[in-house]
Amino acid sequence: MCRGIIGRKIGMTGVFSDQGEYVPVTVIEAGPCVVTQIKTVETDGYSALQLGFLEKKASKINKPLAGHFKKSGGVGFAYVREMAVDDPSAYTLGQVINAELFSAGEKVHVAGLMKGRGFAGVVKRHGFAGGKDTHGCHSHRVPGSIGTSAWPSKVFKGRKLPGRYGNTRITTKNLKIFDIQPETNLILIKGAVPGSNNGLVEIRKINA
């Protein structure tokens, strides 16, 4: 069994459960993904499926990639990712993998690119409390002391300081699948997942 799929975050909404509880969910377009390469222990040292997601114009694909995609049907893809697989022999080149890989109630890990926030201060970037907001205070959102001049006479590596925040890959774990709509390849996941709307996400089974 393939252990994951590529998808695109559509956005967030809310639905009601059978018990009448309002549940915030993230809607993800999961696939359809096409198997573009099959990796085995004998040939590559490990087992995996290379999946292609979102078709791309042939004029936008370079010749090496076009030759690679030709082996799986000739259709080019904008995104290619590898997913672990239990038995590679159960799959063939060009085979389609969709949202039916998962089931409602299953827990998954979702990885994506965090929203980029640019250069940010310590209050926004690290959650510092900030200084006092009283009369006479001139340091409301500054980090404070980062070391003395006598000792250590330097700033230690890893010190929480202002800097570029976001635009990094993060994984949100143990999210529950609320519902699956196979006819539209939509997966409704309880809670929030990383990234902005239309951003690429990877949905993996636990222990993948």
Swiss-Prot record:
InterPro entries, per database record: Ribosomal_uL3, Ribosomal_uL3_bac/org-type, Transl_B-barrel_sf
Pfam families, A to Z: Ribosomal_L3 (PF00297)
GO MF terms held by the record: rRNA binding; structural constituent of ribosome
Entry coiled-coil feature ranges: none
Keyword Signal: no
Assembly with partners or alone: Part of the 50S ribosomal subunit. Forms a cluster with proteins L14 and L19.
The protein's name in its UniProt record: Large ribosomal subunit protein uL3
Protein encoded by which gene: rplC
